[in-house]
């Protein structure tokens, strides 16, 4: 699919609006078409996707997909964007039983099974944990103004900032201990985090949606939005959100 849209000339034209209200680019639409064709082979599953919303099925399974997480990176050719797929037995975060994130840039494949651990390219994660004293904080943001406003609040909280452009991948990197905390300055949807949150939780790392229901009760839909904080412990998450809220 990406080979058919090799540059931003082909990838960035806006072809519509997603159900969530964001513009749908050509690369978003092409990726979603491919993944939905595959997922619709799962008999009876309800599919929840950023672009088309909810496609109701008759079965118990719910598949939550973000065909391109990191759309701006994808359309500009920056190799840090991902496919994110979560499979759930119900309608909330606690019901997610499987998560899969594919990094289109590196080719890394991240997977998690509820109560079965998390893996990177088949190798178990969890040995390298994020540091409680935050050396690297991954910000996820869209506007320069929001970064400028909140970065000052991180002085004394985090040593270095990274803004990489894919919330799902940033959470995967947290699960692997590559970064020490993740904060989204823009409110995220369930499709952005449904798969990656399972990797984080299976590694015993804290994650919260401070502006939503209790994390496990957060609905797997395209309507709800909240900022996301994730770090080594609940206490670190609370301190981060308090600093961001000043």
Predicted feature locations:
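Residue-level signal for inorganic ion chemistry
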Residues: 28, 39, 71, 112, ...
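Oxyanion/phosphate-interacting regions
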Residues: 1-10, 152-155, 172-246
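Glycine-rich active-site/cofactor-binding loop and its immediate structural neighborhood
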Residues: 62-95
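Short, Asp-centered acidic motifs that coordinate Mg2+ and/or phosphate
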Residues: 46, 98, 180-181
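Acidic beta-strand-loop-alpha-helix segment within the catalytic core
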Residues: 82, 86-172, 223-246
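N-terminal subdomain of lithium-sensitive/metallo-dependent phosphomonoesterases centered on the IMPase/IPPase/PAP
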Residues: 1-68, 241-246
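General beta-strand structural signal in soluble alpha/beta enzymes
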Residues: 46-50, 65, 74, 120, ...
């Amino acid at each position: 699919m990406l080979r058919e849209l090799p540059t931003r000339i082909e990838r960035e034209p806006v072809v519509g609006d997603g159900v969530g209200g964001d513009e749908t680019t050509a690369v978003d639409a092409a990726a979603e078409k491919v993944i939905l064709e595959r997922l619709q082979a799962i008999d009876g599953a309800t599919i929840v996707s950023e672009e088309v919303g909810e496609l109701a099925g008759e079965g118990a399974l719910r598949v939550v997909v973000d065909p391109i997480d990191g759309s701006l990176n994808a359309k500009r050719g920056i190799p840090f964007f991902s496919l994110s797929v979560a499979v759930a037995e119900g309608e909330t975060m606690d019901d997610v039983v499987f998560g899969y994130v594919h990094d289109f840039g590196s080719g890394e494949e991240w997977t998690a099974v509820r109560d079965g651990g998390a893996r990177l390219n088949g190798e178990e994660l969890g040995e390298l944990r994020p540091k409680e004293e935050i050396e690297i904080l991954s910000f996820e943001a869209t506007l320069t103004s929001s970064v400028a406003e909140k970065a000052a609040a991180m002085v004394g909280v985090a040593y270095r900032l990274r803004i990489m452009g894919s919330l799902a991948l940033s959470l995967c990197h947290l699960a692997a201990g590559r970064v020490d905390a993740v904060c989204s300055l823009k409110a995220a949807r369930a499709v952005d985090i449904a798969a990656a949150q399972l990797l984080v939780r299976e590694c015993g790392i804290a994650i919260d949606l401070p502006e939503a229901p209790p994390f496990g009760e957060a609905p797997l839909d395209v309507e709800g939005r909240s900022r996301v904080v994730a770090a080594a412990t609940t206490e670190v998450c609370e301190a981060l959100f308090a600093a961001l809220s000043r």
